[in-house]
């Protein structure tokens, strides 16, 4: 019965994204189109180079563009019309490569139509993008090999798949050691009742198949990923009275998380780290997640998990890392040495962000009152 239900959901989602939706404006919630922090200049410029039709058919719920992408091999799960793939392909450069996989044939056809357009737009000798018509929970069937990618991204798609554990398991399989799954998706404040989980429109709107947010950490640990790192979160609003009635007291949030795959070797205690600076678009400051922002040349105390991730990932050359007690060279500036409470709840982060926005009053310099000053 479960297999039959999953197949029915899959068919409904294909119909919704292949035939019902024609543009992002057709969506009935903001669940698939929200973003929660400013977009760096180099990404804005890359977005402007994406063909208009590709951008029009974009249904993602965030901007899944992590940092330090030069020469990386990236896989986009549920690539749709290819918007994120084409942005990423420009950022990884000619020595990098981006593969997009999507189960909706019409979306893949839109994406493939503009391969030459973007290759010429970027001035590349050959296209560094490949699109595959396939299923994100069956990457092996699509020919994607073990440990073949540096980064896996996904933009508001995993919620559309009934077997989320299988999707995460496959992402883990194809990632290299030190690799990262960086993805935006929709999460719920509680376990969803049957009425929501079987509602066709809510499935298509990324709500019916949303994961209870606490379950992500359970699945990540089961598969072997490091604990999820919350990056951004934004509360979802419903613009349809009938859908509001069905949803009732359940709340939804679009959130970006990063999951790292690394060996268990590395620092076993808290460390002090210094960001060397220089990452494209983040030369002076790297907002790693909701809990850690690293400024160039500044000492920051981190927990052992964060230290291990920095040491074993593509960020290894961007940081000086020393166990607490060993002296770090520094160019001066502030020292943020106190570990704060780690935020893991996307609803808490979204509410805090909304509260800060409501209290924010532009000052004469265009900034906000009440914001912390850097020393």
UniProtKB/Swiss-Prot annotation:
Enzyme Commission (EC) number: 2.1.1.137
Subcellular localization(s) per the UniProt record: Cytoplasm, Cytosol
Signal peptide per UniProt: none
Pfam families: Methyltransf_31
Highest taxon of source: Eukaryota
GO biological process, alphabetically ordered: arsonoacetate metabolic process; methylation; toxin metabolic process
GO cellular component: cytosol
CDD domains: AdoMet_MTases (cd02440)
Protein purpose: Catalyzes the transfer of a methyl group from AdoMet to trivalent arsenicals producing methylated and dimethylated arsenicals. It methylates arsenite to form methylarsonate, Me-AsO(3)H(2), which is reduced by methylarsonate reductase to methylarsonite, Me-As(OH)2. Methylarsonite is also a substrate and it is converted into the much less toxic compound dimethylarsinate (cacodylate), Me(2)As(O)-OH.
Protein name listed in UniProt: Arsenite methyltransferase
Phylogenetic placement of the source organism: Eukaryota, Metazoa, Chordata, Craniata, Vertebrata
